[in-house]
Amino acid sequence: MVAHLTEWGLRHFTSDTAYFAWQRQTVSAADLNRLHACIARKQAPGAGTAEETAFYDATAEPSLIPALYSQRYEYYLAIAPRVDARIGSARRILDFGCGIGILTTFFARRHPESLFVGVDRSSASIDYASRRAAELRLDNVEFHRIDVDREAVSGSYDLVLATHALLQAEQDPGIPSDRWESFARGGDVARQTAFELRTGLAPRLDRLLTMLADQSRMIVFEKTRLLARRVPFQRALAARGLRLLEPPEPVRYALVEEVADDGPLYVLGRPVQGSGIDWSEGPEEVDADTVNVDSLRGRPGSGEDPLYENHTAAAQMLWQSLPDRRVMKEFTREGQDGRQLHAELGTTQDLVYLYVANTFDQRQILLIEEARAGVLDCYFAEIEQG
C-alpha cells in the first residue's frame, strides 16, 4: 500500500507542523480559500446534496489531492489491508462512494482477475479516478458517476464495499439512550425511521442491497464508533436481513497527530437462517478497571489533577461500586428533545467523587482527596451552569 500511495503523490506525516508546512508549499492560498468556502457552504444550515457534491468536486482538484489526502495516509494503511484480505473469491465488486479511486485502484491491482466498479456522485472525482486508472494501466476497473440516493446501479455484485460513504452525516449525533443511567435504546420505530431518512442511510442501503447477488457480502466501514450512531446503523442493517459474518472490528489510526477511533469494520451477508453472529447494542468492552479506594488514600495530589479518572463506559460500573457512596449534590437536566445530562458530587469513604453521565453514552468519574474537594466542586458548578 505504501508504494501505491506514493504513486498517488501522498506523503506520510506524524507532525502537524511538518504537514502544514508542506501544505503551504504545495497548495496556493487561493485554492485553500476556495476549498474553505466549499466547506463552509457544506456545513451551513440547510445545506444538502448540492453543497456536499460541490465540496467533493473541489477535493478532486489535481493540485489539491496530494496535500488533502495525505492527511488520511494512515486511514488508507489501516483500511486497505483489512478489506483486501476479505475480497477472497469475489469476481464483481462494487465500491460505493469511491471518491477519486485511491482504494479502488489498489484493490484492482491486487486482484487482476476481478472486476471493480467504483461509483460516486462527484463527477470531478470520477473523472480523476478514470484518468488515474488509465495511467496505472488497469483494465479491470471502471468508474461511473451515479448518485445512489436518486439513481440505481445496474448489475449484480458478489461484494459491495462502502467505506465512509453510507453514513456521511458526521454532525448527526444519532439516537440517545432511554435514560442517563442506561445504554439501552427502546425500539421506537419513528426515531429509527427519522434517523435513516435525515442521514440518507435508507435510500442508499435499499438501492445497494438490490445489487447483491445470492450469497454475496458487504464490507462496511463508517463513522459509527459512538453507540448513539452505531445502534441505529446496525438496526438499519439488521432490518434489511443483513447479519454479521464475523465480529465487528473497531479501528484506530492517526490523522497526522490526531487519533481517530473509527468504524467498526463490518463484514455482512444474508446467511441461511440461524447462522451469522448476533448484533450487540452494548458499549464496547473495556478493561474492567476497578477503584481500590484504600490504595488512593494518602497518595500525594497536586494542582487540579484527580487521583483517579475514567472516561469510558466502565465509569458507570465503577460509580455503582464505590464503597459507602454518599451524594452531596446532584442534578439531572432534560432537554425538550428528551436528552438528559446527570452530574453528581459525593463522597466515597474519605475521598470525593464527581460522576457525569448523559444519554449519548458519555461517562466520566473523577476521584480526589477531601483536601482538594474544591477542584471537583468548581467542575460540578461549571457543568451545572451549562
Predicted feature locations:
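Conserved SAM/SAH-binding beta-strand->alpha-helix loop
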Residues: 122
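Conserved SAM-binding loop of SAM-dependent methyltransferases across substrates and taxa
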Residues: 100-112
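Conserved beta-strand signature within the Rossmann-like core of class I S-adenosyl-L-methionine
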Residues: 188-193, 215-222
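Mobile active-site "lid"/loop adjacent to the S-adenosyl-L-methionine
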Residues: 163-207
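Conserved alpha-helix/loop element of class I SAM-dependent methyltransferases that forms part
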Residues: 70-89
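N-terminal auxiliary segments of SAM/dcSAM-dependent transferases
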Residues: 1-44
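Conserved SAM-binding strand-loop segment of SAM-dependent methyltransferases
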Residues: 137-148
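Conserved SAM-binding loop
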Residues: 129-130
